[in-house]
A protein has these predicted regions:
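Feature captures the catalytic ectodomains and active-site-proximal regions of enzymes
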Residues: 1-381
Length: 381
């Protein structure tokens, strides 16, 4: 694979045969560290092979007629680049403690293909559908796509109106689309549950406080002009789980952290949800680890843990709380690459314009801050 000369069908056949053998059989991976590492090697090879084939189909890069085409293309196929890159690196990380060098060259080539080709190429194509009077930034809406701030009305209230007794909503911080696609496949393949997948157009800028507020029932969203630029739903702060619970009380709902719900157990859990129609459950693993410099290299491991925890959480809701409908969503996603960013990848916007109220690495928010040729500019209204 590293030499770009492998027959991928032959490779997959070989991987399948080796997995069924003694040393890397999935039924025996708990036997020893070397057995688990061998199994991870084959996971990495399989992901790299699929990535190579996908890249060959898009060798000329990406081109979209508009934002709708870009979003549809991503959710249909392009998301696989992010997924396979994550799966490869997660598997390769499991091999590293053994001190084996067999994946090192392949890892370098995967990194070059992802951070040196895929991210820049997709970024260029995405930029083109943002700009201009008819671009996405001029009107943050796409035909056929639900905006994130309409989540409650379109996804929750619609089910209640249709007769569903109780809706459980799990919000997993930074749980991105490609990971959700993997979860849906796992759920449909291993359990009696039926899972489907759809996407929304996220709020801009995409960060936790705004994304979490957008998912709540509300009539208005606005910024409070204080030091933190708090997001207000219907004039009330909703930055904490308790405050979100207060907002949900207006629709006969409650808010709770995932760990706290699981700790209640079956009987107390049923008592907790008995008089409620809407239960918002907050899960945080990916953002907790991936958004900190000291632990960001654990991002892909956090995704793997999240897939397991969300499956367990949904199973608990259905089996122990008699839930019939569970909606799983996120406040935002994430973008992560193993190699550090080059200076060319970083914004050249050094000074904060007059009127800036909130300044972060990825965005600035303010009143009348104008436009800059070094950044994309829009209006939160």
């Amino acid at each position: 694979i590293a030499g770009a000369g492998a027959d991928m069908d032959t490779l997959r056949t070989l991987v399948a045969r080796r997995r069924d053998g003694h040393w890397a059989n999935q039924m025996m991976v708990q036997a020893s560290a070397s057995s688990r590492a061998l199994a991870a090697c084959y996971d990495a090879l399989e992901a790299a092979a699929a990535f190579s084939e996908l890249k060959a189909r898009f060798q000329a890069g990406f081109s979209f007629v508009d934002a709708g085409a870009a979003l549809n293309s991503y959710q249909q196929e392009i998301f696989r680049f992010d997924q396979l890159y994550r799966q490869f690196n997660h598997a390769a990380d499991a091999v590293e403690p053994m001190g084996w060098a067999l994946l090192h060259e392949l890892r370098e080539r995967m990194e070059s293909a992802y951070s040196g080709w895929f991210i820049p190429q997709l970024g260029l194509a995405w930029n083109k559908v943002l700009e201009g009077s008819t671009g996405l930034l001029a009107r943050w809406q796409v035909d056929g796509w639900i905006n994130q701030q309409d989540f409650y009305a379109r996804h929750v209230q619609s089910h209640l109106d249709a007769g569903v007794k109780r809706v459980f909503v799990i919000i997993s911080d930074a749980f991105r689309f490609e990971a959700a696609e993997e979860l849906v496949r796992e759920v449909n393949g291993k359990s009696r549950f039926k899972a489907t997948l759809s996407a929304m157009l996220g709020v801009l800028p995409s960060y936790t406080a705004l994304g979490m507020a957008a998912l709540l029932p509300h009539q208005t969203l606005a910024y409070k002009q204080n030091a933190n630029l708090d997001v207000m739903a219907d004039g009330k702060p909703v930055s904490t789980v308790e405050q979100r619970g207060d907002q949900l009380a207006g629709v006969q709902g409650v808010a709770i952290k995932a760990d706290d719900l699981l700790a209640l157990g079956k009987d107390k859990g049923r008592e907790y949800v008995r008089d409620q129609r809407v239960i918002y459950i907050y899960h945080d693993k990916i953002d907790l680890l991936g958004d900190k410099q000291g632990s960001e290299r654990e991002t892909f491991d956090a995704v793997a843990q999240t897939l397991t925890e969300l499956t367990q959480l949904a199973t608990f809701i259905v089996n122990s709380l008699n839930g019939s409908l569970v909606l799983l969503t996120a406040d935002h996603g994430f973008l992560y690459q193993e190699s550090p960013l080059d200076e060319a990848d970083k914004s050249a916007l050094g000074d904060k314009p007059d009127g800036t109220l909130k300044a972060k690495k990825r965005y600035l928010l303010g009143m009348g801050i104008g436009e800059s040729p070094k950044a994309w500019c829009g209006n939160t209204q």
